[in-house]
Amino acid sequence: EGMGHQRTVWEMVDAAAAGRTTEAISLLNGLLDAGESPIGLTAQAATVLRRYSTAARLLGGPDRPTSLGAALKEAGVASWPKALSQAELALRSLGSHRCRELPKWLESLDRSLKAESSRGLRARLAIERFFCMMSTSAKKPHEK
């Protein structure tokens, strides 16, 4: 059950990062319905997403890595081929702007889950809203 659960969390994060919001929400619902903690799920997701954010920041910096793969490795993404290819796809799907916003969005989600949205429907909605913010259809603040 542990590895299956872990795989499902990774699939959920991959789906959300790739803009497959409906799939991510469906996986989230399955995990929550199975009794998983919203805070625990978001903590696991945050670990992965912070690495994407770090890679995007490295790529935009003055001493940037030579490739997307190198930036991801430097950010702490596992160097086995499947992990790197999924991370590259996620980073490309999210784009640098949304990747750089992830820490702020994660902090807001964390505060919300630890306050009024700690359980039940409010927790589910807070995480769903976060996935929607990650979606490629979500506009940047300066876009109309």
Which residues fall in each region the model found?
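Solvent-exposed, charged amphipathic helical/linker segments at domain boundaries
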Residues: E1-V13
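Helix-rich C-terminal "collar"/helical-bundle subdomain used as an assembly and partner-interaction module
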Residues: T8, A17-K144
